[in-house]
Amino acid sequence: MKFKLATLCLALLSTGGVFAQATDTIAKVKASGVVTMGVRDSSGALSYTLGDGKYTGYHIEICNKIIANLEKAAGKKLEVKYQPVTSQNRIPLVQNGTVDIECGSTTNNATRQKDVAFLPTTFVEEVRIAVKNSSNITSIKQLDGKNVATTTGTTSVQTLRKNERATGVDFKEVFGKDHSDSFLLLESGRAEAFVMDGAILAGNIATSKNPADFKIVGEVLSVEPIAIMIHKDDAAFKKLGEDTIKEMMKSGEIAKLWDKWFIQPIPPKNTRVGYAASESTKAAWANPNDKPMEDYAKK
């Protein structure tokens, strides 16, 4: 019995050691010389592809700043590997260590906080409706009997269903595997509306073939804090990321990045997203925090 108990204790200690090592991002990248950034193909001006394996955007720049400080902590130059993620696989890829830092368009909510950690909110988003400019739709109440697009694995799916129950409106959900696919459903006429974060809608409209053909309408369906995601229970890396973002907020650098990506022309077509920072976003910059979206709903 004593032998079995000792063996069990050793096994548990060994497992704990592996876990500690697995969640120590600074030690991991120092050993490998590589840091893996989770990126999105079409998350508006937050994170998107330029083609040929290149990615850019508001969150990409913030993550690059964090990685610069990660290099200082690791004491070496790191190779940055881009790992495209989707709304469905982003959390599992952070959990299993494939992705070290996810720089897309992820909503921080209480359910996700059980599985991953979030750095301070970089902007507070409002979920809205995009339609064709020729459409008469101005509210979710007018979506009865219509095909409504959204992206698989996003909080907008829950938002749609919640509003459907609350309003008694009966519409058919059609899903894109990523935001560009969801927008294509609207663009091609297979859906009459696309429900998603306003910045993502604005970004996809801005980079579409004919931006004037689309508009964002309707009431705010949900208010959601968007943040960069990292592995849970990694105190050292979380502090490094928090300190980096807090300094960017304090210095005004993050406001300048917002202007660069959401107000000024952006590559590759030099189009403007034209999406001003909300008062809630500015409040998050003034008082950095990692509160989940449920806290915003209480206000």
Named regions from a protein language model:
Residues 75-142, 282-294:
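Acidic, polar ligand-binding/catalytic clefts
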Residues 89, 104-114, 159-166, 184-188, ...:
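A ligand-binding cleft/hinge motif common to bilobed small-molecule-binding domains
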Residues 22-102:
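Extracytoplasmic small-molecule ligand-binding "clamshell" domains
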Residues 41, 123-134, 206-245, 264-288:
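Periplasmic-binding protein-like
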Residues 61-69, 141-142, 146-147, 152-154, ...:
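Extended ligand-binding regions for polar small-molecule ligands
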Residues 36-45, 55-72, 107, 125-183, ...:
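Bilobed "Venus flytrap"/periplasmic-binding protein-like clamshell domains
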Residues 30, 155-174, 212-214, 246-299:
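Ligand-binding clefts/hinges and TM-proximal coupling segments of bilobed small-molecule sensing domains
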Residues 74-86, 169-178, 218:
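Short beta-strand-to-loop elements that line the ligand-binding cleft
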